[in-house]
């Protein structure tokens, strides 16, 4: 039930963020979900100028230092979750920091040996969700694969609110509730910077095909208002709800 409430509130906030510029005269729409959710910072880490796919001693040593740094950040609870992305030519990892401050998250990112050396380059976004992820407590080296879906503006996306978009939104939320009740969709939340990226879904399912099939049932996706990019996301066991 808590997960269901979390997902519902997250989508309510997603609506308020998307319409913030067009509906500033309606502050309650933004304030109510924000009072229930927590702001974090999400870093999308892409290949940097020093990145290379070729194996080398330098790359192996950098990888070890990078992983050690991530574990230290997870243990200190500064980093809520971090994992490797598969199937994208540029995006390598996604990290979520337990802070609403972009400056603080940037400072933590710059402490990462792989970032400071130019192997990876972070792209930071404010992100909202209820605080449902658990502090890492399992032994090192145990991972699980979830499926991370980025919701982006689709070809039919518009900022205007109309009866048609309201109907789509109602169907969108009903579908999220259905997926949450199935215990397939475990985390959802909107980005707060009103850009092309609108939010994320995290699926705990057996395959990317199943994640795609579930995501495709969303009326906002079917209508073209939202589009999806889904990737395997390898994260430490025991953190996702």
Language model features: what each stretch is:
Residues 6-16:
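Bacterial N-terminal signal peptides
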Residues 1-6, 21:
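Positively charged n-region of N-terminal signal peptides that target proteins for export
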Residues 21-241:
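Conserved, structured core segments of small domains
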């Amino acid at each position: 039930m808590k997960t269901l409430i979390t997902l519902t509130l997250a989508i309510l906030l997603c609506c308020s963020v998307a319409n913030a510029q067009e509906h500033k005269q309606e502050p309650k729409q933004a304030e109510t979900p924000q009072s229930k959710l927590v702001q974090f910072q999400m870093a999308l880490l892409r290949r940097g100028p020093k990145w290379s796919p070729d194996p080398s001693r330098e790359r192996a040593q950098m990888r070890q230092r990078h992983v050690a740094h991530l574990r230290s950040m997870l243990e200190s609870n500064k980093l809520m979750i971090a994992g490797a992305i598969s199937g994208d030519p540029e995006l390598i990892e996604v990290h979520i920091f337990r802070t609403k401050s972009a400056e603080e998250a940037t400072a933590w990112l710059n402490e990462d040996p792989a970032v400071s050396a130019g192997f990876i380059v972070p792209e930071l976004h404010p992100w909202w969700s209820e605080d449902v992820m658990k502090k890492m407590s399992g032994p090192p080296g145990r991972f699980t694969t979830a499926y991370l879906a980025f919701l982006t503006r689709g070809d039919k996306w518009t900022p205007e609110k109309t009866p048609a978009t309201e109907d789509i939104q109602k169907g969108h939320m009903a579908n999220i509730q259905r997926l949450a009740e199935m215990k397939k969709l475990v985390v959802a939340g909107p980005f707060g910077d009103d850009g092309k990226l609108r939010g994320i879904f995290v699926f705990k399912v057996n395959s990317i095909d199943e994640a795609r099939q579930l995501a495709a049932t969303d009326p906002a996706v079917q209508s073209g208002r939202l589009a999806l990019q889904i990737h395997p996301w390898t994260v430490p066991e025991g953190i996702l709800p």
